[in-house]
């Protein structure tokens, strides 16, 4: 049994594996192992792995279950104390995983530890997906230490302290295996996007903490700064609304019900005015799917174990703060 399993979920990602897997294999030694979970790839990923890394454990899934379902199924076959979920487009360096395990070993009430994420294409900059730890505002909009909406900061050591956060990016998150399984893992209805924040919110409602440990730094290629596809817009909006309905307090849900339709309507109008009608329609479809899910979400909400109040939700609007000039996390707090 490994202390730590670094699990990379792959779907048609041969080019990312070829570019980034060598650093992961080189710097993941000792009591840690590397596992590839494959979401039924149709490219030559598995052939390439068999030729170049014949000793790596590969878990083959029978179809593409997305991020949520793929990890849920793969992790059932991995016997380890801790899982380090890692995107296939992440580069690591020597000593990258040990600080994360040290936190979990030392602090028994921590469920997830995040490394600091820098950009693989511009290493002096934070990376959009997670930077130095994630938060959300009361309307459910995510932001990071190092990234406010689309404004990404340069990493000058300003967020190098280890501290509690609200969420760790699914691009690189180290979690306690027992807690992951006890809470049922990711919500597979999400398929992809927001599922890691949803899980970590549920963890906090059960009394667990989420922490960032910047002594561990990884470099993520990512796609957060690229123009989002209509599918990404749809998944982000639908899953965000579902997460809020499941996890938020009644007062927060009331605020979301009153304000979010207007805010999302303004966003959809912006897409229309900039000649992106498919993205505007994606927001409409997201609300429609959310309403269809209403009954099943009510059951999920009742099933969540709520023994603790969750702190760390930003009580103001990140969007308004951004519109009034806030471009760094330090300006927010």
Locate predicted features.
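Active-site-adjacent helix/loop segment of glycosyltransferases
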Residues: 7, 206-302, 307-317
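Short, acidic, metal-binding catalytic loop of nucleotide-sugar glycosyltransferases
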Residues: 23-31
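Short beta-strand/loop segment that forms part of the nucleotide-sugar
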Residues: 31-40, 59-61
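Glycine-rich, basic loop-to-helix element that forms the pyrophosphate-binding segment
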Residues: 60-78, 88-90, 99
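Short aromatic/hydrophobic "clamp" motif used to bind/position activated sugar donors
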Residues: 83
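Conserved donor NDP-sugar-binding/catalytic core segment of glycosyltransferases
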Residues: 91-141
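A short, conserved alpha-helix in the catalytic core of glycosyltransferases
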Residues: 160-217
């Amino acid at each position: 049994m490994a202390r730590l399993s670094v699990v990379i979920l792959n779907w048609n990602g041969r080019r990312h594996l070829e570019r980034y897997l060598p650093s992961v294999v080189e710097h993941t030694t000792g009591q840690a192992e590397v596992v590839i979970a494959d979401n039924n790839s149709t490219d030559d990923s598995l052939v390439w792995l068999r030729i170049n890394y014949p000793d790596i454990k590969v878990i083959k899934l029978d179809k593409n279950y997305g991020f949520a379902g793929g990890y849920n199924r793969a992790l059932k076959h991995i016997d380890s104390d801790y899982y380090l979920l890692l995107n296939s487009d992440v580069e690591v360096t020597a000593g990258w995983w040990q600080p994360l395990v040290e936190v979990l070993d030392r602090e028994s009430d921590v469920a997830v530890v995040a490394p600091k994420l820098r950009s693989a294409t511009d290493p002096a900059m934070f990376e959009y997906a997670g930077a130095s730890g994630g938060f959300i505002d009361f309307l459910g909009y995510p932001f990071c230490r190092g990234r406010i909406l689309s404004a990404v900061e340069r990493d000058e050591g300003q967020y190098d302290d280890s501290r509690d956060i609200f969420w760790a990016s699914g691009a690189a998150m180290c979690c306690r295996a027992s807690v992951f399984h006890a809470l049922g893992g990711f919500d597979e209805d999400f398929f992809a996007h927001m599922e890691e924040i949803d899980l970590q919110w549920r963890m906090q409602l059960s009394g667990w903490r989420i922490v960032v440990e910047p002594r561990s730094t990884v470099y993520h290629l990512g796609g957060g700064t690229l123009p989002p596809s209509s599918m990404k817009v749809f998944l982000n909006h639908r899953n965000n609304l579902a997460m809020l309905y499941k996890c938020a307090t009644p007062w927060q849900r009331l605020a979301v019900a009153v304000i979010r339709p207007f805010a999302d309507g303004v966003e959809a109008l912006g897409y229309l005015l900039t000649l992106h009608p498919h993205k505007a329609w994606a927001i409409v479809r997201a609300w429609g799917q959310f309403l269809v899910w209403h009954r099943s979400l009510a059951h999920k909400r009742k099933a969540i174990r709520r023994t603790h109040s969750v702190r760390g939700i930003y009580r103001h609007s990140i969007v308004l703060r951004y519109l009034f000039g806030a471009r760094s996390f330090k300006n927010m707090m």
